[in-house]
Each structure stands twice: as C-alpha cells, then as structure tokens.
C-alpha cells in the first residue's frame, strides 16, 4: 500500500461483508490525503475503492443495529456499498469510534486526534459537533466547545457505564523530543455534554472493553485503557464507575517519547482464541476477556516483536497485522552516522499474515518496569500493582536516598482477586537486588513503606528463556557471514514500486515478483546517495567506535574482523 505522503501507516484492518477492509493514513492530514480505502478479496486481490478521501484515520467500529462498518470516514453496509462523510463536514484526524450514550441504535461517536468529538447519524450521516477539533479550520462552523483537556495526539475511544472514555498520548513543547519524563498525555471521560474531564495525566492509547469492535453489549461491562509513563506501562480498569490502576513491564523503550509519535495505535482485540491479543511497547500480550478487579490474573507476554502495528484482526484462519513499515519522511530519525537521503522514495506499508501459533514463537519476551522511579514517598505509601507472573526469570532492584536503612514490604495478590498478603520484607540500606524464586508466585506485586523515603526506585527486570538456539534461522541464509568467501556487496534503496541495488558499478531493480533486471544508469544516483557515511563510525584494535552528540561509544566487535579492513 502506497501514498504520496511522508508516511503510510495502516490505520484499521477489519473483516466485513466477506472481505478485508483496510485504511492507510498520512501524517497530520485532517482534511484528507492521497491515502486509500482498500477492499481485499479472499483470493487476496486488492481493490482500491474510488470513494477514498484519505486523511489520518484509525477509527473502526461495527454498528450492530444498522449492520454497518464505520472505518475512517467511510460507512460500509453488508452489500459493500461505501458511503463517505467528507472532511468538510467532520474535520480532523479520526482516531476512534464508539457507541452513543443516548441513542446507540441510530448514532455513534467519532473522536479526533486533536480532542474533537462528533455524533454521527448512521442513517443519513449527518454530523453534530460536541467538542471542536484542535486543528485550525476557518471554514467549519460547528456548535461544539473548545476543549481545555491537556495533552494531544488522541488515540482510543470507547463507551460503557454511561460514560465515554478518550485517550491521548502526547504533549507539545520543546522538551518532548528529549525528555521522556515530561508530563504528557491524558485519559479523560465525557458524560454527554460539556468538556472532557481529566481522569489521569499520563500517556494513553487503546481504550476498549469485552465488546471489542462492536462496543460493550452490557452497559455494566468494564472499560480497559492502556498507556504508559517513564516507569512502566499503565493499565486502567473502569469498573462500576471507579478507576483501578495496574502496571506492566515494557518490552521495548523504542515506543517511548513524551511526544507520543512512536506508538501508532496499540490494540486489544479478539483473534478467535480464549484470550484477547494485545499489542503494546513491543510485546504481544495475552489479555483475559473477563479481566476485572476480582479476576485480574492471566495477563502474560506471548513474545516480543520489532514491528510498528496499527491494527490487526483474524481473517481466513490467520492473524493479519497492519503495519507502519517504510516512511519517506525521517521525522526524528536523524543521526550523524546515517545517510540523510536513505529513506524510501515513496512511503509504503504492508499487511503481515501470521499463523496464530507463530505469535508465541517470535522474540523471547523481556520486560522492564518500575512502580517508583526516583520518587519521594510519604509514610504509609503503597505502590500501584505491578505484574508479577508470566516470565521465566524475575528480578527486582530497590534504591533510595535516605541516610538510614528503609523497610520495604512486598505484598502479593496471588490469584488476581484483589486479596493482598505479605510476601517478604526487606531492610534496605541504600540498594538491594533480589532475584525471585520460582516458589514466589502471584498475579500482582506491590510495595509499601512505613516512613518517608527520598528518591525511591523499585524496578523489575523480567525475561523468558531463549529457546531459539545459537544458529541463525534459514531466513538469513542469503546474508554473507564472516567466513563467506564468495560474496557481493552494494547499496539498496526502496525506490517506489521496486527495490534498487547498486553493486560493482552496475544498477539493478527487483520487482514485487522477485524478478531482477539490470536497469538504466539514471537510477544509480538515487541509490548511491543513500550510502552510509563513514565519518562517524570507525574501528581500532579494541572495538568499533560510534560518535554522536560529542560523545564516543565503543561497541564490541568480533575478533574475526580485521580492524584495518574497510
């Protein structure tokens, strides 16, 4: 899937009316773009719908009463008829769709990434504005109010228990690209009128419940919201009108950033198995469909991944992941040791078709999370619960800044039923490292202090066993190793619909049918300019050396490499 924008992410992937429907998005396009609505047949024929108007959409919901799919600005019935709400009538980057609080049989809500909120009549597609979209727009004359909700870069939207829940995961400001501890994001509610009401000032993404893409069937059903801060992932549970926090470890820190730009749209979705599948910070999560305050056990990592996933669904026996693969614009990815012209010439992304069992066979799960991170604590303070189960190996580090030893009490919720018992007590002078035994079990762990504590940190390191063996998988057979005698080298670059390669002075192109042809020399310059500069990476007899921001970093180097060889 291609567009003419700086990025081509996958906003939504939904099986509907015997087909798979997919939308892509460009970066910050509140009034439309070159992106498309795709209809994919069971035989994997890709149909680009002529109704496409693009934008930056990632919202999707199946409206049961009218038997329609809302995906982006499009409404699709069972006969695959597509109707469109133009951005002139509903401006903004559509990020979430939810069931209506007052008239769910005939209306739904659509929220935007700049905190806008609309009601849409599913029959005539008329629109009513409740909260104005934050993008400048002098032409649109809606009746909504201007929000005062902090944060920006909206993500999830869901309704239940008489409330609409909205999440954003970003912040504006000069520090957001450098300091991940910057206060950022918001989890908010709306009760049918007025402005968003702040629930928690952290970065949040997915908001959903047991009803998934259809919305909750019972208005008493819970809502789950997934987010993070500098310490860990954050899972919020709304049950019986009250919020309950939980913390999970991060599988990767690559998705961090107070700006919120690195996550795309994490999801918790049904995939035809007992448990739901969650994606967040590089981990595939097993998420119990009946997760609640008294039934919170069972969240567990399945594996770690390196993709950036926007949405996914089960279709024709496989899990289809819509990814954000190759952007023409480099955004924040500017480094002195990489080419300034190495990005693909045209943004593109693909669908990743995966057998369900493969999800458990990817990268070994790792997790890192804190309940306190250089925090000053009050006497009697109790941490939020942190995941304690699901990993083969678990370790905890405690540090504090008091002059005298501090007592930390560990409490465990063994069954996930909300009943806490003391697991162990530690007297910590300055720091402590504790490796948990296999006999120390439970769903959740929390800590308690009896006195004031300065600069307290409690951090968890988790990992699974790596069962992959020492050898590389067969997918790497075509890559030259240190001992390969017959090899070739060159520079490759994504060049619109082909892969271009410059090797040995000759220029080649590889198409989507894996046909390699020698091309005209005119394409060689495009590839050559993408070559990696050598000025910031060097080697000596001890190691490889990378220079960045005035500092030098040494990286281990195999002794088989000759430091004098290029």
Each model region followed by its residue ranges:
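Entry beta-strands of beta-propeller and related beta-repeat scaffolds
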Residues: 19-22, 65-70, 103-109, 159-167, ...
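Loop/turn-rich, solvent-exposed surfaces of beta-rich toroidal or solenoidal domains
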Residues: 223-225, 233, 246-292, 386-389
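Beta-propeller blade signature
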Residues: 35-42, 119, 179-194, 235-239, ...
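Repeated scaffold domains used in trafficking and secretory/extracellular systems
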Residues: 5-11, 52-66, 89-106, 134-162, ...
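Beta-propeller domains
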Residues: 18-55, 72-86, 120-124, 130-132, ...
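Short glycine/acidic-enriched loop and turn motifs that connect beta-strands
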Residues: 27-31, 76, 115-116, 171-174, ...
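Noncatalytic modules at the cell exterior or secretory-pathway interfaces
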Residues: 438-455
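Blade-level signature of beta-propeller repeat domains, shared across WD40, Kelch, NHL, RCC1
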Residues: 311-373
